[in-house]
């Protein structure tokens, strides 16, 4: 049979064939999703996306560090006055102040022993003239005198009887105008003028100080959302990788900059005890030690320098009346007697020459204001005012509407993939991962620079005192310290034991008399002590006080006649005196008679014409002849009161009246203005000593001993040591020789007054004091015996002419003269002629008497402020301090004022006519204040003579009365507000001597 092919064993595997073509896709499997694959490597960072929309505001950050201090801002305006702080602790005591002013005079000391009589004083001034003596006894008849010289020619005889009347002369020319008459009485005050136009706008004031920075504004409202950005191309979304493992710690970074100023740390624990410090500076003077035992009595000091001459003692008692002096010379003629009765009118004189032109009259009083003028043209525009203060921030505006969203843009075409870019910027940090494990601590960094000094922490509580340190080795002796400053004056130590009496010093001059001390309470009588040895002679005591007035002395002799005193003030006109003797014949008159006129016949009387207007006053006619002496007329009425004479000299100051009863206490006045800030208070007392410092470090080893230095200066005396135990009594030593006088020690503090010494022997008489003031006039002495008649004085001046004597009897006719007499004077006027034509109008007559005052007009409009008046006369030097007023309510804080200059008080002196009271209801407190003020004003106007209100005070309150007025709403009239100004009148004598300049600065005035 044909051989059957038998399969051989499998051959080796052939090589791999080429891949077949892909099969068709299998059906979609439905298995569950497999687990996510492992993270791939981080891809390269994509390009940064476009900025997203603005996120919502983040949470409030932690508080930042304090910034550096800003520059100093401008000073803000003064704030309102704060409430008074609590009183500070007392400061350390100040240095000893300068010596205080002399204290008030001490009380009067006891009367000293009477001094020896001084030498007679200088001759005093002549006493006042004595009273005239009585008439002396009639003298013996003198020897017959020789014949006197021929007397002067007698006075001219009286003129003869008047001759017959001559014919009427022609009418004289009119006389010259008379001198201007006296100024008429001022007319009534004019009506107040209309108010003036407003003044031009004043220049702008200086720019005010910058205001304080305003408070920080509130946070603004959240801004609107921005418009949506353009949509970016969509990025490929990678899955977020898991957080990688924590990396190794990096190398130490570069040294950081100094950190910001940290907050103050809490107090650290107390550090270890430090090394001993260097020796500290000498400490402050410790508190005064206990008073040491009294020192030994010092050596007597050198005699003091001669004291100053004491002030003159008070005048001694009046001496006895001296013997009568010789008669003085006749005094000067006395003052003129009182005005006599008014004489009869004299004869008409000649016309005098034309008088000189009178001085210009005083300017008339201010006339009434004229009618208002027409309105002026409109003024130019004034300059721009200063910029105003910055306004307050306005209210927050309303929110605007939200904008409409923009339209969406078209998507762009996809671009070709670009090449891979460079590595992008670091992406934004992912959300915060969980906290990793703590890494190993890094190596310590280099020490940073010291930070800024932190603010000091609060003061820690005082630590417990450390344990007492070991005592250090004794250091080398330090150099002598400078003597410490004088400590504060210690309290007065107890009185030491009295030392032995010092050597008697040179006798000083008498000291001034002390003032009288207050009488002490009477002590109980002590037991009688043993009589001590007489003390050394004391200084002469001050002169005693004036003794009681002595008994009335015997009448002294008349003193010398004094000089005539100055004429007194004219007294009131007396009643008419008795008729005086006939006066001497007057001198011969001038002879100026006219020529004789022909005697006219007397015409028949004409009918009486109409009275013409008064003609101008004719000139005075010539002097007529002296008529026969008339009979004595009846006594005239008392003359008018003469003009006041010059003021007499000031009278002596009267003695003060007895003290009046104490008035009831006034009501409290209104509160005064706030005073200026007071001076700083005195330095407070010394603080307590501080805690002891830690013990110092042991000093170095002692150096080799130096050579002994020269002795150092004497150190300040140490504090008194504690008293040692008493030693045993030593045996008495030999008496040493007296040491040299020591230098005078510094002046010690004033000791307390010692007990009074025994009265000393009278000292030598002091130098004569200055002449004491003249004593008061003594009582009027009794009339002394008549003195011898004085020699005749020179004849006095010719007295005034007496009143005309009684009319004498008619004399017998004289013999015919040798020559014919002068032609007689013009005869009396004839009877009236027929009426003439009406004459020209006469000159205006003198002003008539002032009419009665019209009824009060309604109050005028406000007048313009008057000019400042003159400064008033000086007020008294010192007023009494008024009672404290009730505290007022605190005022609102004022705006800061502009710096003010001084201004003149004088503006108050003009009356301001109208100031309506802004507050109608006046409360009780104001009423009571007004009442007490008016009482005080009344006491000032009529003082009661007590020491606090003497009678001769002249207070110038007039300006105060006229200064201010207010409207009384109830009655509707103006009242002077005498009590509404919170200041009294000031006069220059209140602020210094009359020749000193002084200024015043017055703040704004508040009305009640």
Curated annotation (Swiss-Prot):
Instruction: Tell me which GO cellular component terms the UniProt record holds.
Output: collagen trimer; extracellular region
Kindly list the places in or outside the cell where this protein is found, as annotated in its UniProt entry.
Secreted, Extracellular space, Extracellular matrix
Disordered: region residues = 1-920
Bias type Basic and acidic residues, positions: 39-53, 423-435, 807-821
Q: Can you give the residue ranges of the Fibrillar collagen NC1 domain?
A: 978-1008
Q: What molecular functions are annotated in GO for this chain?
A: extracellular matrix structural constituent
Instruction: State the InterPro entries in the record.
Output: Collagen, Collagen_Structural_Proteins, Fib_collagen_C
What are the UniProt keywords, alphabetically?
A: Collagen, Extracellular matrix, Secreted
Which stretches are tagged as biased composition: Pro residues?
A: 1-21, 119-132, 604-617, 761-771, 884-896
Main localisation, per the record? secreted
Biased composition (Gly residues) is annotated at 133-151, 253-265, 696-709
The biased composition feature labelled Low complexity covers 92-117, 152-195, 204-230, 339-354, 410-422, 437-456, 489-524, 537-573, 634-661, 717-735, 785-806, 832-868
UniProt keyword annotation of Secreted present: yes
Family according to the record: Belongs to the fibrillar collagen family.
Protein name per its UniProtKB record:
Collagen, type I, alpha 1a
Species for this entry: Epinephelus aeneus (White grouper)
